[in-house]
A protein has these predicted regions:
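A polyampholytic, Gly/Pro-enriched intrinsically disordered region
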Residues: 122-131, 153-154
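ATP-binding N-terminal substructure of ATP-dependent carboxylate-amine bond-forming enzymes
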Residues: 1-125, 138-146
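Acidic/histidine-enriched active-site and ligand-binding environments that engage anionic O-linkages
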Residues: 147-156
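A cross-family glycoside hydrolase active-site/sugar-binding cleft signature
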Residues: 31, 81, 133, 200, ...
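Structural signal for short hydrophobic segments within the conserved structured cores
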Residues: 47-49, 111, 131-137, 168-169, ...
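ATP-dependent carboxylate activation and anion-phosphoryl transfer catalytic cores
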Residues: 7-16, 20-23, 48, 71-73, ...
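N-terminal nucleotide-binding beta1-loop-alpha1 segment
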Residues: 159
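Structural detector of well-ordered beta-strand residues that form the stable sheet scaffold
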Residues: 29, 79, 101-103, 131, ...
Length: 453
């Protein structure tokens, strides 16, 4: 087992990893930008090292400085968390060359799943259903037109090396196709340095269902109950829950086994997430694999009792899985609301600033993961998430009631937050019935109230 882990991240995930390490008897090193000197992860770790100025490119994305910090402090492993360098295959390679263990999959697995075109080809070969579309990169408009004649409109143009909604365009007709390809290529080039795009059939009103997997170095893979991440705004998740109201036991097993096949196809080790789109008929299609710990991993922890961060560390250290598939069962229901420092009344613009009061909810069945405290100043340079509120209930109804109570107790003063917006979601009758799709926010929260006026 590792003796000292450097956490190459900040905020709540850095704090989450430090807590897991403490329980495992592993010493920790926090890295931080000049802006983050007073952050909670810096105060909580055994050691801390400043790695650069506030801008991420000069600190949390600065590979030489992070490696130097690990070597100076004698860390034998680096945990990348999520975001920043978590899915950077070059960083994983550099760690390996410096004899520092990267807590994640191999650089090869990251590369294969990071290239969406290559990932589709691998999944096709592994027998995992993919959305009908191009077999490779689309180079010309003529090539695109030929393909679309087969799969029909609507289609979606996607960046080959992208994610998070960038480099994506939905196309309803031939007139819009050429412009969509050029726009997506330019956006992908700016965001990812790679202008390549591919085309898929656009699945209308799908659910976004993902499966957490755990895999060891001997090739054993297990899946956890699904997470429903359909509540999104501009492809960014706002609320996740487990289990899904739509997924039957039979479908869960089929999709879970498909997720395991996906992991085995790239010889995946540690924890990861396989994401699917599921249509109204229950047909499911591979979308992508996230080769890291997810923001929403606590949802799965609550319904299984498995500490995913500890398991990630154990598996990276070469230990075997200590659970069989039959040991993993759905227990109750959990929901996560991502609370951001944003003004939902002004198109969700970030709201950085000093927190003058911060009181988190508590009571039975309520977990809050946060790095915020009264007096802390939220910097404008990073992600705006300030807390994850996670109620657990014996069933979905109890989990929703507990979330409503928790959000009503949550006091944040000094900045705007998305708490009022989350409360609107929870009060929506369609959400309560479990009728959620990826266009839920636009259709049921934004457009529907306006249509009644």
């Amino acid at each position: 087992m590792f003796k000292k882990i450097l956490i190459a991240n900040r905020g709540e995930i850095a704090l989450r990893i430090i807590r897991a390490c403490k329980e495992m008897g592993i010493r920790t090193v926090a890295v931080h930008s000049e802006e983050d000197r007073e952050s909670l992860h810096v105060k909580t770790a055994d050691e801390s090292v400043c790695i650069g100025p506030a801008q991420s490119s000069e600190s949390y994305l600065n590979i030489p400085n992070i490696i130097s910090a690990a070597e100076i402090t004698g860390a034998d492993a680096i945990h990348p968390g999520y975001g920043f360098l978590a899915e950077n295959s070059y960083f994983a390679e550099v760690c390996e060359s410096c004899n520092i263990k990267f807590i994640g999959p191999s650089k090869e697995a990251i590369l294969k799943m990071g290239d969406k075109v290559q990932a589709r080809a691998i999944m096709r070969k592994a027998g995992v259903q993919i959305i009908p579309g191009s077999e490779g990169v689309i180079s010309t408009v003529e090539e695109a037109l030929k393909l679309v004649k087969k799969i029909k409109y609507p289609v979606i143009v996607k960046a080959a090396g992208g994610g998070g909604g960038k480099g994506m365009r939905i196309v309803q007709n031939e007139d819009a196709l050429k412009n969509a390809i050029l726009t997506a290529q330019n956006e992908a080039k700016r965001a990812f340095g790679n202008p390549e795009v591919y085309i898929e059939k656009y699945v209308e009103e799908p659910r976004h269902i993902e499966f957490q997997i755990m895999a060891d170095s001997k090739g054993d893979v297990v899946y956890l109950p699904e997470r429903d991440c359909s509540i999104q705004r501009r492809y960014q998740k706002l609320l996740e829950e487990s289990p899904s109201t739509f997924i039957s036991d039979k479908l869960r097993k089929k999709m879970g086994k498909a997720a395991c096949r996906a992991a085995r196809a790239v010889k995946y080790v540690t924890v990861g997430t396989v994401e699917f789109l599921v249509d109204k008929d229950g047909d499911y299609y591979f979308m992508e694999m996230n080769t890291r710990i997810q923001v929403e991993h606590p949802v799965s922890e609550l319904v299984t009792g498995i500490d995913l961060v500890k398991e990630q560390i154990r598996l990276a250290a070469g230990e075997r899985l200590d659970v069989d598939q039959d040991d993993i069962q759905v227990q109750g229901h959990a929901i996560e609301c991502r609370v951001n420092a944003e003004d939902s009344e002004k198109d969700f613009i970030p709201s950085p600033g000093k927190i003058t009061k911060f009181i988190v909810p508590g009571g039975p069945g309520v977990r809050v993961d946060s790095h915020i405290y009264t007096g802390y100043t939220i910097p404008p340079y990073y992600d705006s998430m300030i807390a994850k509120v996670l109620p657990y209930g014996h069933d979905r109804e109890e989990a929703i009631i507990r979330m409503q109570r928790a959000l009503s107790e949550f006091i944040v003063e000094g900045v705007k937050t998305t708490i009022p917006f989350h409360r609107r979601i929870l009060e929506n009758p369609y959400f309560k019935k479990g009728e959620v799709y990826t266009n839920f926010i636009q259709k049921r929260i934004i457009e529907e109230p306006n249509s009644k006026q």
